[in-house]
Amino acid sequence: MIGSLCKNEAATKDVLRSVKAMGYDEIELNGFMTHPTSFFVRMLTKLAGMPTGKAGKYDWKKLVRDAGLGVTSIHFDLGTLERDLTACIQEAKDYPTSRIVVTGMYRFDYSDLKALEELSARLNKVGEQLAQSGIELLYHNHNVEFKRVGEKNQFAYEILMERLNPDWVNFEFDSYWAAE
C-alpha cells in the first residue's frame, strides 16, 4: 500500500512519480488517505497495518495530476455514502473516476444472516443511486466476509454475491484477505 510510504508531502510526490515510472497509469485512493482523520482513526489504521499519517491533509487531486496518474477508483465508507452521497459523487467526478469502492466493515457482524441481508439492501440502494450518476459501486472484501453463515453454511461473501444486484454493485476481490 503506497499510503505507508507517504510520510510527508515530498515523499508522497516521489512515491507517485515512481509509481508512474514503473508503468502504472492509475491508482486507487482510500478515504483514509484523502481526508483528514482523527488521531483515533489513524491509530486504528496503523494497528491494522495501513498507516496513513497526515496524508489526509494533502491535495491528492493535484499530487495525482502532477505525477501524470489517473484515479481508477476511490474508497468511501458506506455510512458516508448514505449520509452525503452528493458530495461523494462530486469528489469522484473531480478526480475524475467512475468507480467508488466500499470496503468490508470490521464492526459489522458478518456471521448474522439478517444483518447481511440488510447490508445487501443498503449497498443495492446506494449502488442504484450511484448508477444514476454514471458511477459504479464496487464492494472490496477483507477476511471478515469469509465467515460461515446460516443453515447452508455459506461464506458471507457468497451471500453478498447472491443478494447484490450486479447492475448496481460489483466486486473488487482482494485475494490477500481471502487467503489470510
List where the protein language model places each region.
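Acidic/histidine-rich catalytic cores of soluble enzymes
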Residues: 27, 128-180
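A short acidic, helix-capping loop that chelates divalent metal ions and anchors anionic groups
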Residues: 35-40, 108-113, 146-148
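Repeat-unit-sized solenoid/scaffold elements
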Residues: 70, 88, 92-117, 169-180
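An active-site-proximal structural segment forming one wall of the substrate-binding cleft
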Residues: 81-103, 115-133, 162-164
